[in-house]
């Protein structure tokens, strides 16, 4: 499977291409040479180079990884982490927005409501999922699922991965801002545990609408910001080409969000990013979700709401 190497990974890509070429020659038996030693040498060199590059990534490089086309999406994690997933559709008012997926599932045997934004892989799916940008009906579907979880006393797990809420005219006419605001209000008052994880892009209000939780996590190479680096650059410098500078200035990385107290945990990704070792990433994420829910399950409704309120009110203060 092609790893779709990013620009800053090109030295790694060149080594991997050499390795694949040598393996291909060896498999065809065209040369009476022992290629195993050379393949091993190049593999070791590729590993060392990957470690070196990924030990010093800038904010813009992290932003590129957060958008990687092979990065696991919500439905991938649902498949790898949960069992007995039963998807629920529609907002019971207008339509079913497929940019938001959710339903009842089991996490290590415990019934939970899992909700997340879903991007697409191929062109048709990207269009069907609206490139992971939910409309009001998507957020109202998420709200309906969260209220169902409240009714049946199920913990809520959300996966955040969106460039932002859809800014189209129709979405605005149907109350995009109201839908986001209502979700924030309701999530702050739910009496069941809520664990949120940014798995890719955490874009502005579109991310916050399913991001109010008792525990908020970020994967190591995910981002969280009020606007995309390109959008910020277009406003401040009148050119999207300044996106790398904007990414650094905004502090979009998980490490920076943790320093600011905006998230509780940064979940390490396998070397090279979650897309290279999806199953391993799922194991790490599952472990964190189970630990978070375990720490919250023993709290009373009053304790849960008090902790959540204090957490929200601490934002913006030293």
From Swiss-Prot:
A Pfam family assignment: ACCA
Record localization: Cytoplasm
Pathway(s) served: Lipid metabolism; malonyl-CoA biosynthesis; malonyl-CoA from acetyl-CoA: step 1/1
Top EC category: transferase
PROSITE patterns given in the database record: COA_CT_CTER (PS50989)
Enzyme Commission designation: 2.1.3.15
Function: Component of the acetyl coenzyme A carboxylase (ACC) complex. First, biotin carboxylase catalyzes the carboxylation of biotin on its carrier protein (BCCP) and then the CO(2) group is transferred by the carboxyltransferase to acetyl-CoA to form malonyl-CoA.
Homology family: Belongs to the AccA family.
Name by which UniProt lists this protein: Acetyl-coenzyme A carboxylase carboxyl transferase subunit alpha
Gene label: accA
């Amino acid at each position: 499977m092609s790893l779709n190497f990013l620009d800053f990974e090109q030295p790694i890509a060149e080594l991997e291409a050499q390795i694949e070429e040598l393996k291909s020659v060896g498999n065809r038996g065209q040369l009476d040479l022992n290629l195993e030693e050379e393949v091993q040498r190049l593999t070791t060199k590729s590993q060392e180079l990957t470690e070196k590059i990924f030990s010093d990534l800038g904010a813009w490089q992290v932003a590129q990884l957060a958008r990687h086309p092979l990065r696991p999406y919500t439905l991938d994690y649902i498949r790898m982490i949960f069992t007995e997933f039963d998807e629920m559709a529609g907002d019971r008012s207008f339509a079913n927005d497929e940019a938001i997926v959710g339903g009842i599932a089991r996490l290590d045997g415990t019934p939970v409501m899992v909700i997340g934004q879903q991007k697409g892989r191929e062109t048709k799916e990207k269009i069907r999922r609206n490139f992971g940008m939910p409309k009001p009906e998507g957020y109202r579907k998420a709200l309906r699922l969260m209220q169902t979880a409240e009714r049946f006393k199920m913990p809520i797990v959300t996966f955040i991965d969106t460039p932002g809420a859809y800014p189209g005219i129709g979405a605005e006419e149907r109350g995009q801002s109201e839908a986001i605001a209502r979700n924030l209000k309701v999530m702050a008052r739910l009496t069941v545990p809520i664990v949120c994880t940014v798995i890719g892009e955490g874009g502005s209000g579109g991310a916050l609408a399913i991001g109010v939780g008792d525990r908020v996590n970020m994967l190591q190479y995910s981002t969280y910001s009020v606007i995309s680096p390109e959008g910020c650059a277009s406003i401040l410098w009148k050119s999207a080409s300044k996106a790398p500078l904007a990414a650094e200035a905004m502090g979009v990385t998980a490490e920076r969000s943790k320093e600011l107290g905006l998230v509780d945990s940064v979940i390490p990704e396998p070397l090279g990013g979650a897309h290279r070792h999806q199953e391993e990433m799922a194991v790490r994420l599952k472990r964190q979700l189970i630990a978070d829910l375990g720490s919250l399950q023993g709290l009373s409704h009053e304790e849960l709401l008090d902790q959540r309120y204090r957490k929200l009110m601490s934002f913006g203060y030293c």
